[in-house]
Design a protein with these regions (language model features):
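Active-site gating loops and adjacent loop-to-helix segments of metal-dependent hydrolytic enzymes
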Residues: 1-16
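His/Asp/Glu-enriched, well-ordered alpha-helical/loop segment
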Residues: 17-102
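C-terminal cap of metal-dependent C-N hydrolases
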Residues: 93-128
Length: 128
């Protein structure tokens, strides 16, 4: 979490609490919230990396006022719908089968997304 927050409050206009309040207000206004849209580690920016940062981002979305299920949707079905990716973002016949099996219940405790037991990509279980 500290690493994800590392970029906030580093500029005169940076304000982490304002960022959380903005996400909350946008969500309350019905604006689709998309998770994972700014992982820019490959450009040398501190604070984010593809994959692992998403778990922290989900925690921050919950901290901003989204329910855990809404945060999970922000990383799955909402981006798929927003970008017209009909083959992903939900569990349904014919959809791309990229899944995580976790210990716990991330719909009530978002940090449980970090307790990954198994991973499937395109319907095939990956080697651990």
């Amino acid at each position: 979490m500290d690493n994800l927050c590392n970029e906030f409050n580093t500029f005169p206009t940076g304000d982490f609490d304002a960022a959380l309040a903005t996400v909350k207000a946008l969500h309350a206004a019905g604006v689709p919230i998309l998770a994972g849209s700014d992982a820019n580690y490959h450009f040398g920016a501190r604070g984010m990396a593809h994959g692992v940062s998403l778990h922290g981002e989900l925690r921050l979305l919950v901290r901003a006022g989204l329910a855990p299920t809404e945060a999970l949707r922000a990383a799955t079905s909402v981006p798929a719908t927003t970008f017209g990716l009909d083959d992903r973002g939900r569990i349904t016949p014919g959809a791309r089968a990229d899944l995580l099996l976790v210990d716990g219940d991330p719909t009530s405790r978002i940090a449980d997304t970090l307790s990954i037991r198994d991973v499937w990509r395109s319907g095939s279980r990956t080697a651990r």
